[in-house]
Structure formats: structure tokens, C-alpha cells
Amino acid sequence: MTDHDEAAAVRPLALAWASRHLEAGERIVRTEVLHGGVTAETRRLAVGARGGGTRDLVLRTFVGVEHAEDWLDREAGALMLLKGTGVPAPGLVAADPTAAYCEYPSLLMTHLAGRTVLDDEGLETRVPLLARQLVAIHAIRPAERPREYVALTTADTVVTPKGADAVAWTAAIDVIRQPAPPYEGRFLHRDFHPGNVLFDVAPARPAGARITGVVDWAATSWGPVDLDVAHCSANLALLHGPAWGLRFAEAYEEAGGMPASTASERLYWWVRDGLAFSEEVRLVSQPWREAGRTELTTRVVEERLDAYVTALMDAPG
């Protein structure tokens, strides 16, 4: 096996486990680290057959992740649920949630074509595609509901960025001191954002982009669609500027999505998710820099978060 670099090497037990789930005559010939995720280490495994052809699988390894067994069980269950729904998700090959066979809890799945696209170019084309894909996810009606959503950020855990608009942030924190508004539950991805969506897009034709896959289903939940909308909006705001966060919410409605009926209810979910980023700016910005957005330093992302929260609090309605 040839590794692209030392980091790409699959741990011995995980390699043996993955190999046991190949077709007769196949073997793993190459591995490659896939960047962009936060929850798990992700590697592409190139699988060679006797006849000379190859196919790819993806190995997700949950190293040092609290509640890894739970995360992995949820993702495996979601992948089985999504089969046949029309949502472009990976197919489940095997799961080892308790690390009975691997060094760490691991998940083996099919590889989807495409790549994540985090560049500014072509964003006006991709935002409506993201919105339509999220509407399709929310249209899923599972026979068995996933667990209810969990929102861990509280008014007391918010970290106000240095130099932030104190008035806007105080008002935003006061918003999430209130009880959550009532909602009609739907199936949620719960981590839907550009880093978890794969596109087929030619560099010379960014306007011809199409979505080929949605990945990282470990946080699937049941809850208000506004949570998913808010999460993607916040990611877009930090990646591309606050205006794009607000634009995504509009695009979701234009695509047929049904957010909360009142502006105050929508604001609650948007603010809650935006403030959650205040606790993990370093964590979320590192994969973006690894993916080529080197200008997105922690400070730049903090400034964009401040501008986004301020824009939410200044928005009419």
C-alpha cells in the first residue's frame, strides 16, 4: 500500500477490519486523508480488484471523541434510513461503534463523487442548490424519528469576541435566555453546511455546479427546520460574509422550505446557532484554512461572526 503521506496511513486494526469487508480478490492499494471534517478523521481508501479496476470507500474514525459510540450509531442508522430517499448520501458498508475490531470507533461507507467547494466564486449558483437540497432533506418522513435535537449553547456559555458590538451581543444573548418557541418537528441533518456537501463543478464553469452528495450524518435529529437553516446560514456568513448568511435563509423559503411563521421565532433559532459559533471559532476555522481558505484566520472569523450577529439583530421584522 502506498500512502500519500504519513497522516494518510490507516491504523493496522482498522485496515484489517476494512479489508474484511471487501469483495473477493480486492485489496486496499492507497489511502488519502480527506480534509474538512471536525467530528472524525476521514480517509479515502482506493480498493483494487484482480482485473485492474479500482473503486473508493471512505473510512471515518472517531478518535478521542466524547460519545463516539453514540455518534457512530446515529450516522450508521441515518445512512440506512436515507437509502432510497433520493438524498445523495453514502451507502453503509460496515460499522464498528464500540471499537471491537478497530483501534477506535469506525465507520466504512461508499465514496461519493464530487468535492467540497468553499470558494467565493460561483457562490450565487451554489446557495440556491444548497437551499433546495436542505428542503429535500426536511421532506423525509422516517418511519422512526431520530432523537430530539439538543442545543448546548446557553446565555452563560457565549463568548463575546474581542471588540464586538456590545449592544448587539447583549441583545442577542437576551434572545436565547427566552424559552424556545414552539415548532413542528422535521428530520434534520443538524450539521448541514458547505463543508458537508459535495459538488461536481468544473473550474471553468462554476455556474454549472450540481450537488453530488451530502455527508456527515452523525448528528441527525428531530426538531425545527430553522435549526438547519440557521446552521448553514451561519457557516456561509463566516465563510463568505454576513450577507450570504441572510441570503441563504431567503433561498430556503424560495425553494419551498417552511421556516417558523413569525420573525421573532426565526430570530431565536438564527441567533442561537450564530452564538454557538462563539465557543468554537478556532475549531471550525481550522478545516477551512486546511482546505485553502488561509485568509480565514481566527480573528477574521470572529469579526465576521460579530458582523453576522449584529446583522441579525438589525434585520427588519
What is each stretch, according to the model?
Residues 32-149, 182:
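ATP-binding pocket architecture of kinase catalytic cores
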Residues 25, 83-86, 96, 115-116, ...:
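A general structural signal marking secondary-structure boundaries and capping sites
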Residues 6-26, 136-190, 194-209, 257, ...:
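An alpha-helical support segment within catalytic cores of ATP-dependent transferases
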Residues 13, 74, 129, 133, ...:
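Charged catalytic carboxylate motif
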Residues 227-258, 271-290:
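Active-site activation/catalytic loop segments of kinase-like enzymes and analogous catalytic loops
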Residues 25-33:
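Short secondary-structure junctions
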Residues 35-47, 53-54, 58-59, 92, ...:
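Active-site acidic catalytic loop and adjacent metal/ATP-binding pocket
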